Amino acid sequence: MTNIRKTHPLIKIVNHSFIDLPXPSNISAWWNFGSLLGFCLIVQIVTGLFLAMHYTSDTMTAFSSVTHICRDVNYGWLIRYMHANGASMFFICLFLHVGRGLYYGSYTYFETWNIGVILLFAVMATAFMGYVLPWGQMSFWGATVITNLLSAIPYIGTTLVEWIWGGFSVDKATLTRFFAFHFILPFIIAALAMIHLLFLHETGSNNPSGLISDSDKIPFHPYFSIKDTLGFLILILIFMTLVLFTPDLLGDPDNYTPANPLNTPPHIKPEWYFLFAYAILRSIPNKLGGVLALVFSILILMLFPILHMSKQRSMMFRPLSQCLFWILVADLFTLTWIGGQPVEHPFITIGQVASILYFTIILILLPLISLLENKLLKW
């Protein structure tokens, strides 16, 4: 009798993806983040579904409904804080996953990489719309500021913004449509993640050396299923520590004040995971220029396969590129810090220098250093 795992049309797909999948024997813990992102997505969809059962997307009752969830619903506070902090864990895993891809040259898998960038945009859009739903001060003003950026688009800008708002300001119509989109997008993200995985399994995983590993493959189960389980446990430990001990650590106190269109908060800023892009946006004095820089700061990831000049795939054996990569990481930390600071001296200048450095490293220095390394190795 043949094994049902290998013959059943549906189980066979699962088998080829998670059980008998040949994986390189030398992949490190940096390869755990894909499965951790899948775990985060499931947590977000489940907690989000339970929150949606009690939430009302009306400007008059949205804030009260979130309060009701936290006070009156059984374990509502836990579900709400798991959902809010789950987004932070999601982005931590995302940034590490993308960073791994950049360091080890995983972007040479064009389709997998480009779908990954689309996924990043989709997750950012979902997180932004989710932040608007509690209808606190930062929700309202964040939505106003970010949607207003579209008015920088020549000719159609103002019309486009009013179309998105469903009126002449962020109001009931905006909240309702944001709730609808925030609900549907995670399922689109799940579908995209499956396509992401499909393309990855066409080529097989990359590995730290960047060399072809066809001669040295091991089955995913039990080796990497056990390794991923350890990753899950560490993630759950950090995640639940955050949720149960300091649930508001990464949030903004202003969001505990109900939205008031007549009172602007002193410092409007997004959640921490958008601060680097927000800093780039603010560092350009021109509105359209800032919006373009904001979009391009993420879209630039799609250029990495084109900008790859090295004869080697991974940075494992390229110390000069490694050095530049870690300067880029430090620069992103600097941008994140600047994004949360008020717009005044010296933060403006630091932000501008950090923004210029970000684009310079990616577009100019990394390709040049790669060419230099080729020369040094006489390739």
Swiss-Prot record:
Domain of life of the source: Eukaryota
Binding site for heme b b566: 97, 196
Cofactor(s) of this protein: heme b
Transmembrane annotation, as ranges: 33-53, 77-98, 113-133, 178-198, 226-246, 288-308, 320-340, 347-367
PROSITE patterns referenced in this protein's UniProt entry, alphabetically: CYTB_CTER (PS51003), CYTB_NTER (PS51002)
GO molecular function terms attached to this record: metal ion binding; ubiquinol-cytochrome-c reductase activity
Any one GO cellular component localisation term in the record: mitochondrial inner membrane
Keyword set includes Secreted: no
Family annotation (SUPFAM superfamilies): a domain/subunit of cytochrome bc1 complex (Ubiquinol-cytochrome c reductase), Transmembrane di-heme cytochromes
Protein name: Cytochrome b
Gene: MT-CYB
